[in-house]
Amino acid sequence: MNKRRILTFVMVVVLVGGLAAACAAPAPAPAPAPAPAPAPAPAQPAEVFEWEYQTLHPVGSATYAGFHLKLADLVKEMSGGRLILRVHPGNEIVPVYEQTEAVRDGVLDMAHSDLGAEMALVGKSALLLGASGYPAGTTCDEDFSWFYLGDGMDYASQVFEDYGLVIGCLPEGQEVFCYSHKPLATAADWDGVKMRTIGLWAEVLGTFGASVVTISGGEVYQSAEKGVIDAFEYAGPTVNWPMGFHEIMDYMGLPGIHSPGATHTIKVNRQSWSNLPADLQQILVVAIESLGNEFRTSLLINDSASLELYRDYGTNIFYVSDDFQAEIAKRTKEITLQYAADDPLFNEIWENKKAFVKTYKGGKTATTLNYSIYD
């Protein structure tokens, strides 16, 4: 009897509990999982700037491959492909001696030009800015130092203010005095000679009875081969050898008193420059300076080997007499002082550069050794 009551009681409790559970409020639903974060927007591709860059040099020149093409490769690598220089040899887009106007007009974004051919644009001050063809003038090392450590870059940008911005220079070394069909070692040898040259040397040479022709480097070989000119100068031994001048001229003159250094400026269009982000501007400036210094050093090393190529080929090498060199320097100084008297800006640049070179030479002279076990 007791067992039945206990069993009945248990069943009643279970039944009542079940009914209570059924009547209770439902348990709250679990909170929904948070929505996944939206996927990040795809990164926008970096803007790529493509520039047209024309040089002075033809394709066969050592400078074309050794500096200009290397500059394009270096800038592309340093910029991660954001700045592309499309390199063009001289005359491909515009005539060589119209490159500066083309930079001003936006036809070219950048150009490498010889200041010795640009007096008609900006006056005689251009000659002091490292121009090829300034007899007994500054060397490439002096010009390069003045540009980057002195006031050369600022003066260059001032002189060419209406045409673009000067952002660097390329030192190309001392030039060969000339290529010719006969020795031209004395003043008397030059009377009546048709000579291709540029710069102040053209004016000085005229005082010795020569007639001067100004043509681009890419036209020199053909003009000499056809007899349009009797003699010409272009660059140094390393740059000249691939041009094949030894094939058509029997004589080569040394030293290059007419052009101890040829330091060419690199100009950019102002709008193209302002469109570049600051980091790309810096990359281009640094690349030009670094590669310019490297190229200059390579010329110092290779010029000696290139002279041996001329000797092995059979080119007759003559040396300009000391008397003729002294007379060239004397007449150049007279013309320079007259330019300075007539032109205030020329005089300012002349005095500035003269003071810098004096300091440069003073330090170099004081530390130069007279003896070396490598001599």
Regions found by a protein language model. Give the residues of each.
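Short, low-complexity disordered leader/linker segments with a strong preference
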Residues: 1-50, 368-375
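N-terminal secretory/targeting leader peptides
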Residues: 24-26, 43-143, 155-375
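Core domains of carbohydrate- and sulfate-ester-processing enzymes
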Residues: 150-151
